[in-house]
Amino acid sequence: MRILAINIQNFRKLLQCHIDFSKKITLFVGANNSGKTSAMDALGKFLADRRFTFNDITISKRSDINQIGDRWIQEECEEPVDLAEWESFVPKMDMWLDISRNEIHYVSGIIPTLKWRGGELGVRLAFLPKDISKLFLEYREAYFAARKTEKAKEKVEIRLYPKNLCEFLEKNFNTYFSIKTFILDPAKAEADEPQSTPFEMECFTDNPLKGIIKVDMIDAQRGFADPDNADGTERTKKQLSEQMRSYYDKHLDPEKSPSPEDLDILQATEEARKAFDRNLAIKFEPAIHELEGLGYPGIADPKLTIATKMSTSETLKHDAAVQYALSKSDDSLKLSEKYNGLGYQNLISMVFDLMRFRDDWMREGKAKQAKQGSDWAIEPLHLVLVEEPEAHLHVQVQQVFIRKAYDVLTNHKFIKENENFATQLVISTHSSHVARETNFADLRYFKRLSEGSESTIATSKVINLSDVFGKEDETDKFVTRYLQSTHCDLFFADAVILVEGSAENMLLPHFIRNKYPKVYQRYISILSINGRHSHRLNPLIEKLCIPTLVIADMDSAEKEGHHKAACPERGKGLISGNYTIAQWLVKEKDLDRLLAIPSAKKEIIKETPYKYSIRVAYQTPVTIDYDGTVKEAIASTFEDCLVYTNYQLFKEISTDDTGSLVKR
């Protein structure tokens, strides 16, 4: 069993968003504010019972909700009886599962038809009104009461709560709304548009996926802070000592369902308790005698005694339960975990969380005896969500974590021996180093849509990169190797500049920094292709829909034969040997025509919902004053064009004996 895909609607920036899941690891990448966190939160709220807020509704839907409220306050408005009109406004998530024949018993309560024999299975979880009639009546009551109060005193311009239905729901969202689950039609699983909610069918008010999917989540805000900060509540929650206490209580505590191996420690604890009681009796004896001198206890009063209760778990309930030894030769040199580096704290905390998630899922240790009835059964699918694991970690540790995280989650004998019990790991990241360690097919790119593309506000779409370059052809191999070894930061940029040589790669950042301050403030990625390979990235650029500038060399060549390189001249019948210019963007080989093409025709504007453009720049004629004679110079490479354009500057530069440039 595994999750094939989810479809999120009306949840924050994700107005309508389809996300395919990989079999093992799925990585969410994209620029800031592109919806990655929204997708993670949607999974947590729909599947892990996290609390919804009114702001989870896509903000462009508020006017539609207020229109419902405006109708409800009309005197002649009838009480609503169905939820259909809310379908287009509320957060929804469709989940599609792949179920094999021998796993049907797990999903027997949500099969679509009696003829269904496995395969795709879909459910829709929608955050809908619990009781539409109750919401209608209580909103009207609150609204009319507020308006009546406003009229009670003249010359009062204040508008009392609730001004509209959105304001009413903002304070009472979870009171009136809850998750309802519907079974979807597998025959429509591949449809481009999500299917309508089958309101005519009975819905589930309890989570039908409970017992099928176990969901665990590591949030981005993990609470690491200054160890001396007075406000350490969040930090304390994620200290390793606290995590170990929780793990001990659930899986190792010998007082819970004791086994023969636990008897020794229980006996030692009992002997320690008795010794402590005897010591306390001696220490408190003077105080008790003093009380007796005041007449207590009397003849009929119970005698005062001191007794202790000792528990093995209590020994871990302090901040220094986990310490770090600073010297191999001196055991006394130790510090509490809170003084360890933030990076190591984060790494250890995340790895321990993954281990705990796995052992909780497998009902390891004492958890096996603690679970009763249906709770004891192990869910066939474990979904783990990790948000921004790169915090405080340097590059190498980020890469180690992403390589090993899935192995930690599946490092259990039962999981390895039973293929029907699967783990899927979903990670969101801003780190190009994390993206670099992940298979290209596992990346899901979150693309921001500008206002007006599909809504009155900025929204996001998710782009599946699994089949961008086809299946294992030479272009696929080249681009995958290239991006993984150099420039995964492309997935986090607002725009990209492709350059073909090392000179462009070195000089372009300098030009931008010193001459184009507005461009310098943007998130722009400069990719050096190291050759005439820019066109190979065309499928990726079109998939990402990212604004692109390609700086290409003219590479003038002879038209006939093997297209031998030639010095660029007009009227010689030469062509451009650069595929990017001749075949991809300009689609013109003739050198004379290329030199005459205006700038506007060097830009391709893609009229898609994303609306982006690709612009090519190559060498154009430069007029120079050469020893008093004005001449036209045509360059074939970036370096030549740089010299021609700055001819007077280079004339004033010479070299010294060491080869360094000096100005005359």
Stretch-by-stretch model annotation:
Residues 220-386, 407, 413-416:
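Extended helical coiled-coil dimerization/tether regions that scaffold
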Residues 448-664:
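Acidic, divalent-metal-binding catalytic cores of TOPRIM
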Residues 1-48, 317, 323-473, 477-486, ...:
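Switch/communication elements of ASCE P-loop NTPase nucleotide-binding domains
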Residues 216-218, 380-388, 424-429, 525-529, ...:
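Extended hydrophobic secondary-structure segments that form protein cores and membrane-embedded regions
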Residues 38, 104-106, 135-136, 208, ...:
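Short helix/loop capping segments that flank catalytic or ligand/cofactor-binding pockets
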Residues 89-93, 118-123, 211-215, 380-381, ...:
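Short glycine-/polar-rich loops that comprise or flank the Walker A/P-loop
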Residues 58-255, 259-263, 470-474, 567-604:
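Glycine-rich phosphate-binding loops of NTPases
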Residues 51-62, 447:
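Short beta-strand-centered segment that lines the nucleotide-binding/catalytic pocket of NTP-utilizing
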